[in-house]
Amino acid sequence: MRMNEPVDAQPAPSFLPMSRRFRGYLPVVVDVETGGFDWNKHALLEIACVPIEMGADGRFFPGETASAHLVPAPGLEIDPKSLEITGIVLDHPFRFAKQEKEALDHVFAPVRAAVKKYGCQRAILVGHNAHFDLNFLNAAVARVGHKRNPFHPFSVFDTVTLAGVAYGQTVLARAAQAAGLDWNAADAHSAVYDTEQTARLFCKIANAWPGPV
């Protein structure tokens, strides 16, 4: 050992820190449940976010989930067929829905904290058909005039593409099963369940990919 070499010297990690892994962006998985397909006229009803964390070994894992049910914004429509698919009961006594501004504050706060924790510049939305989620999110942000949206306004990581490349599957349920993840069809179309499963899928694919060093 050389005279000036620290006794506890460790080899340099063979992976990039989160702040550099995705050009300064922190992946955050988002899923929304809505009153239809048109973000300009249909209501946002549920949202969930899961920041992606990085362990000491450089492997990714899902962080804590933040979620909210939303009161439909005034003037927006809800297609009854969408409620049949999601199973959302708008007047359920335990739905505890928040107004859009309050709901966005609730889910954005832990995202901003995770961005700061990893020294990233901002969050980048990860989703399955990600621009659907981003468009509804951006529409809600615009409606309430939210000034602290942590997400990139148009860039995304789409697990449809990632799963298509990795497993040859583009449907979330089939992609999750191809990745060796459990899938419960009864829980699907809940923003929390779909977000958490998408986060697991993203981590499975990202951890299998030899990232830049």
UniProtKB/Swiss-Prot annotation:
Give the EC number(s) under which this enzyme is classified: 3.1.13.-
Top enzyme class of this protein? hydrolase
Record's keyword terms, sorted: Exonuclease, Hydrolase, Magnesium, Metal-binding, Nuclease, tRNA processing
Which positions does UniProt annotate for Mg(2+) 1 binding?
Answer: D31
* Molecular function per GO: 3'-5' exonuclease activity; magnesium ion binding; nucleic acid binding; RNA exonuclease activity, producing 5'-phosphomonoesters
By its UniProt entry, which Pfam families does this protein fall under?
A: RNase_T
- Marked site positions, Important for substrate binding and specificity: F37, F132, F154
What the record notes about the co-factor is:
Binds two Mg(2+) per subunit. The active form of the enzyme binds two Mg(2+) ions in its active site. The first Mg(2+) forms only one salt bridge with the protein.
- Any keyword Phosphoprotein? no
Q: Which residues form the Exonuclease domain?
A: 28-202
**Active-site annotation:** H189 (proton donor/acceptor)
Any one Gene Ontology biological process term?
DNA replication proofreading
Protein residues bound to Mg(2+) 2: D31, E33, H189, D194
Q: Which cofactor does it need?
A: Mg(2+)
The protein's matches in InterPro entries, at most eight in alphabetical order, are given as: Exonuclease_RNaseT/DNA_pol3, RNase_T, RNaseH-like_sf, RNaseH_sf
GO cellular component terms, semicolon-separated: cytosol
Q: Which domain of life is it from?
A: Bacteria
Q: How does it assemble?
A: Homodimer.
Q: Note the PANTHER family from the entry.
A: DNA POLYMERASE III SUBUNIT EPSILON, RIBONUCLEASE T
Annotated NCBIfam families: RNaseT
Instruction: Provide the family line.
Output: Belongs to the RNase T family.
| Function noted in UniProt | Trims short 3' overhangs of a variety of RNA species, leaving a one or two nucleotide 3' overhang. Responsible for the end-turnover of tRNA: specifically removes the terminal AMP residue from uncharged tRNA (tRNA-C-C-A). Also appears to be involved in tRNA biosynthesis.
What's the protein name?
Answer: Ribonuclease T
Query: What organism is this sequence from?
Result: Xanthomonas axonopodis pv. citri (strain 306)
Taxonomy, top ranks, is: Bacteria, Pseudomonadati, Pseudomonadota, Gammaproteobacteria, Lysobacterales
Q: Gene of origin?
A: rnt
